[in-house]
Amino acid sequence: MSGTYLDIKMDREISQCEISVIKALRSSLRVKTLVNALNSSGCPFVPDRHIACAPCDQALSGGYDDTHNQVIICSNTCKSDSKVEEILSHELVHMFDYCTKKVTFDRIDHLACSEIRAASLASCAKVNWNYWSFEHCVKAKAAHSMAVIENCDRKEAKKHVDKVFDKCYNDLEPIGHRGPM
């Protein structure tokens, strides 16, 4: 007997996500830069081992699992090539931070810093923002991610983001700049 409609839909979403990941690995300069930086920093990156597409809670788009050193792309919520590329880039920044900066994600200041960097180097980077709008995007994305991960309100998350913002916002490694590539 074949799978149910939901099983078939889930399999199709996972397959489409995997195709989008392959496209990003082949064509996105930002993704290539992050992967090359991981490899050259002594953090071997093997896509089949370090990236997984899977269904997630509807509130999520992806995540970085430091226990398994794996990026998760949510196949049920990331349905376009551009969204997969954005989330993959964002999560690769976390992977880079974990490997090269020895970030401990259960430390709130480490998490806030990595979320600021991921927003600055990936999530907010596709658009030519003016300075204020870009900074606002980074703070808003980082606070949103913190609120989801820590299950806290935006005000509490914003407090943690503001505490480490300047130092983390100005750390541009390994991309080297903000904005489009």
Residue ranges and their predicted role:
Residues E86-Y98:
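Active-site recognition of the HExxH zinc-binding catalytic motif
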Residues S2-D48, A52-I72, S82, C99-M181:
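Metalloprotease/metallohydrolase-associated module, dominated by Zn2+-dependent proteases
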